[in-house]
């Protein structure tokens, strides 16, 4: 009798996902829902889907990504809708290209809900473990080994390790080996990746203190309630209006706050005499030390946000710091409303390892080890939404590869997810990457309102979107097209009643008859205001929304679609079996970069830093001659 044998179903899987954060959740759901026996192995099953930093989902560009995840069949949007306690549409004074939802979530409920859904998911098992080694045979992944020496076999492995690879926490000059306060640090896995040939770097992030609600004087702050309008992140859920029980609050730092920060900089692991933190932090989420040192301002905004319904802890958005605890409490008590504040958990910075994402294909599969995928902060990104999107794509593509089917690679012109992944694998990262609307050159096409129209076909294609929902999208598209064509032919007379209405809306009266579609192109005019002029009134609010946007922004949208068409002629020109050292007239830098990145198309090659238009011309000439 062999005492150490185990049943096959205990250690043999088709897909293993390492890490139970936002990337790991989506990867595991995608794999299991596509029918593959999946293991989610995580260092703390009680912290699955934990909001390690701000208790919020969405935001500028990020909110659109959550909608895209939902359209592809992911879970983040649905769980956000179930657990949000305050939600607002951002940038409502601007055009639809930059509008996005942001929700405060009950972080405890969010984590519990995600864990329950994962536990209930068919084909999926959650298990405790800290992975120390990747098992490889003949250049192909075959499994992992955990810190107990237990091995697990699989045909594909997805690494979603967050900030835990050699994670190290800093509070002043005090340090602790952990990827998150009160959690562990995974030390062996980085060494395994380095041995396999991966280039590894180090980044830094941070989080603010959590403070006690009853020690806050909200009377000195500005209240921010949830929107009065109903909202939902998920296309599967009915929009709802939330109760105004959990407002956020706005306050600010003071000159006295800044003086304390400057006085304590000598003890800062970032700016002190001994610079303990060498890694680069996120440009778009700087610590309060960075703000005070780099920006000459009297004050900086602070958003005071509830962490959940059943907790007294509040999150201080905008006050990330790694200053010593004494500096933290003194500085906080100089802020209006926080004069008597009590800290529940101190702020801290954390350093962690990431891999160079140019070592990945656009599918998020490694170029070095076959069937090994990476998603989330291990790829150099920051943010729950960015991580979840990568996890979903990695999970889908791992499943498609095991099926022997073509992978999904989303274009820059059809999704923010496509923009992000293309940026990562083509340009790489020298600081934590955050999605911004400015990164998307076709952002007017990538709106909050049309994510399902853009991406549901892919979700349905891989089996993550049900047939009834896909049929609903097809029907919606047909209705939009039908009604726009119809409205182009609905005549509106230049009558006194019509002109009185137009003047009341603040727009020019008619001198002659026109078409209803032409009137709807005016920025001041809504369909509902002119609905009585339509012989076939539209009641579907989704159809009305799309008609108004498509008509009002028709010129811009058509111009952008023309740009996309020109761009995609090159984007779709594949680079197959090209030995770049044999391409004449390439610059030395371009040759080195092309050899490293191994772009799959001329479009991808053109976006590699250091590759010039002359290099692209040389490459095009060579490919055409072949």
Curated annotation (Swiss-Prot):
Its main location: cytoplasm. GO terms for biological process: tRNA methylation; tRNA wobble uridine modification. SMART domains: GIDA_assoc_3. Keywords: Cytoplasm, FAD, Flavoprotein, NAD, tRNA processing. Signal peptide: none annotated. FAD binds at residues 19-24. GO terms for cellular component: cytosol. Gene3D superfamilies: FAD/NAD(P)-binding domain, GidA associated domain, C-terminal subdomain, tRNA uridine 5-carboxymethylaminomethyl modification enzyme MnmG/GidA. NAD-binding protein involved in the addition of a carboxymethylaminomethyl (cmnm) group at the wobble position (U34) of certain tRNAs, forming tRNA-cmnm(5)s(2)U34. PANTHER family: GLUCOSE INHIBITED DIVISION PROTEIN A (PTHR11806), PROTEIN MTO1 HOMOLOG, MITOCHONDRIAL (PTHR11806:SF0). This is tRNA uridine 5-carboxymethylaminomethyl modification enzyme MnmG.
């Amino acid at each position: 009798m062999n005492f150490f044998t185990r049943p096959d179903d205990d250690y043999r899987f088709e897909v293993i996902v390492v890490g139970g954060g936002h990337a790991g959740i989506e990867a595991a759901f995608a794999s299991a829902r596509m029918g593959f026996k999946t293991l989610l192995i995580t260092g703390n099953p009680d912290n699955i889907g934990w909001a390690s930093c701000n208790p919020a989902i969405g935001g500028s560009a990020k909110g659109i990504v959550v909608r895209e995840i939902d359209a592809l069949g992911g879970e983040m949007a649905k769980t956000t809708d179930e657990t949000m306690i305050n939600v607002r549409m951002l940038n409502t004074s601007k055009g639809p290209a930059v509008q996005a939802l942001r929700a405060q979530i009950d972080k405890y409920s969010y984590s519990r809900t995600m864990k329950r859904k994962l536990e209930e998911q068919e084909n999926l098992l959650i298990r405790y473990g800290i992975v120390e080694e990747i098992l490889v045979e003949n250049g192909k992944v075959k499994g992992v080994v955990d810190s107990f020496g237990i091995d697990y076999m699989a045909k594909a492995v997805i690494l979603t390790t967050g900030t835990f690879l050699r994670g190290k926490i800093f509070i002043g000059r005090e340090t602790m080996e952990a990827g998150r306060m009160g959690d562990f640090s995974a030390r062996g896995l980085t060494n395994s990746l380095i041995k396999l040939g991966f280039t590894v770097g180090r980044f830094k992030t941070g989080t603010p203190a959590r403070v006690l609600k009853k020690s806050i004087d909200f009377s000195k702050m500005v209240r921010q309630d949830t929107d009065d309008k109903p909202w939902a992140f998920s296309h599967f859920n009915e929009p709802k209006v939330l109760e105004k029980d959990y407002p956020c609050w706005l306050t600010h730092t003071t000159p006295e706050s800044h003086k304390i920060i400057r006085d304590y900089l000598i003890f800062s692991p970032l700016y002190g005499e001994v610079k303990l933190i060498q890694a680069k932090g996120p440009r778009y989420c700087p610590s309060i030390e960075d703000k005070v040192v780099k920006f000459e301002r009297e004050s900086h905004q602070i958003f005071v946000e509830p962490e959940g319904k059943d907790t007294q802890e509040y999150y201080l958005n905008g006050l990330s710091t790694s200053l010593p605890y004494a500096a933290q409490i003194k500085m906080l008590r100089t802020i209006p409303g926080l004069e008597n504040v009590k800290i529940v958990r101190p702020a801290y910075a954390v350093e962690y390892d990431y891999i160079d994402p140019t070592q990945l294909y656009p599918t998020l599969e490694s170029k070095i080890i076959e069937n090994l995928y990476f998603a989330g902060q291990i790829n150099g990104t920051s943010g729950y939404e960015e991580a979840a999107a990568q996890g979903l794509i990695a999970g889908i593509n791992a499943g498609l590869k095991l099926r022997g089917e073509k992978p999904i690679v989303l274009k820059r012109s059809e999704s923010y997810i496509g923009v992000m992944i293309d940026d990562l694998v083509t340009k790489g990262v020298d600081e934590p990457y955050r999605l911004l609307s400015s990164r998307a050159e076709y952002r007017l096409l990538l709106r909050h309102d049309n994510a399902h129209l853009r991406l549901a076909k892919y979700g349905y294609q891989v089996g993550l979107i049900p047939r009834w929902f896909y049929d609903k999208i097809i029907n919606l598209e047909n209705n939009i097209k039908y009604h726009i064509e119809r409205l182009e032919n609905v005549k509106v007379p230049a009558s006194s009643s019509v002109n009185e209405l137009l003047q009341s809306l603040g727009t020019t009266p008619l001198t002659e008859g026109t078409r209803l579609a032409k009137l709807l192109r005016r920025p001041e005019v809504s369909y509902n205001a002119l609905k009585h002029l339509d012989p076939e009134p539209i009641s579907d609010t989704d159809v009305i929304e799309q008609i108004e946007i498509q008509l009002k922004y028709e010129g811009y949208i058509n111009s952008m679609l023309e740009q996309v068409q020109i761009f995609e002629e090159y984007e779709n020109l594949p680079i197959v079996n090209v030995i770049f050292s044999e391409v004449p007239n390439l610059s030395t830098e371009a040759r080195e970069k092309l050899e490293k990145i191994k772009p799959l198309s001329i479009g991808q090659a053109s976006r590699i830093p250091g590759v010039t238009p002359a290099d692209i011309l040389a490459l095009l000439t060579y490919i055409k001659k072949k």
